């Protein structure tokens, strides 16, 4: 190899070595968290109005009073979830526990509350989120999430009644921190629904 070629080869190797050192930390410093839950007892769902729920327009005065995330208030927007294609295990008409779990698509709930879905529009309304209530039994309405963010929407249902069943819910806007004011703006929250039975 000619000395000029050797120098050029050394420069290319040095350049590639430096380039690799610069690029590697960016690649090596990224983590990927993969989470899955495999169940053979899942169901498909259909949500009324293709899952688009318009909460309308309200004034800031709508949020006055001591309405908590636990307080069901008539006047929210009703929607239904229809359960279908449950891969039923075994034979016979047996009692199952149907779970309809709601979680924030982004994984982020409103600051300071695990029961309020956050407003995803950073320049939108502040100190406002969304709550969802089960209204299947009018004598027993409840926020679908407990204070620690766990799901409460578990319903006893017989195998023969599960496919094609409909479940009623209501959603409304909720003030997050009672000590702070609400500011006007848009509100949007994406919620994922998981349905399975035990």
UniProtKB/Swiss-Prot annotation:
It comes from the Bacteria. It is found in: Fimbrium. Disruption phenotype: Deletion of the operon under classical laboratory conditions does not result in any major effect on E.coli capacity to form biofilms compared with the wild-type strain. PANTHER family: FIMBRIAL SUBUNIT, FIMBRIAL SUBUNIT ELFA-RELATED. Belongs to the fimbrial protein family. NCBIfam families: PRK15262.1. This is Uncharacterized fimbrial-like protein YadK. It comes from Escherichia coli (strain K12).
């Amino acid at each position: 190899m000619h000395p000029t070629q050797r120098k050029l080869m050394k420069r290319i190797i040095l350049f590639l070595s430096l380039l690799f050192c610069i690029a590697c930390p960016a690649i090596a410093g990224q983590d990927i968290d993969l989470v899955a839950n495999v169940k053979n007892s899942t169901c498909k769902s259909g949500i009324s109005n293709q899952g688009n729920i318009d909460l309308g327009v309200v004034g800031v005065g709508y949020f006055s009073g001591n309405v908590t995330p636990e307080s069901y208030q008539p006047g929210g927007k009703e929607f239904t979830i229809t359960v279908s294609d449950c891969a039923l295990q075994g034979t016979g008409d047996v009692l199952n526990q149907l779970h309809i779990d709601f979680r924030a698509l982004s994984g982020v709930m409103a600051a300071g509350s695990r029961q309020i879905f956050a407003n995803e529009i950073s320049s939108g309304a502040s100190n406002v989120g969304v709550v969802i209530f089960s209204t299947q039994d009018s004598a027993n309405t409840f926020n679908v999430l407990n204070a620690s963010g766990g799901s409460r929407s578990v319903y006893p249902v017989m195998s023969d009644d599960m496919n094609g069943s409909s479940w009623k819910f209501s959603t409304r806007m909720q003030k997050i921190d009672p000590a702070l004011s609400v500011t006007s703006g848009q509100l949007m929250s994406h919620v994922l629904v998981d349905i399975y039975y035990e």
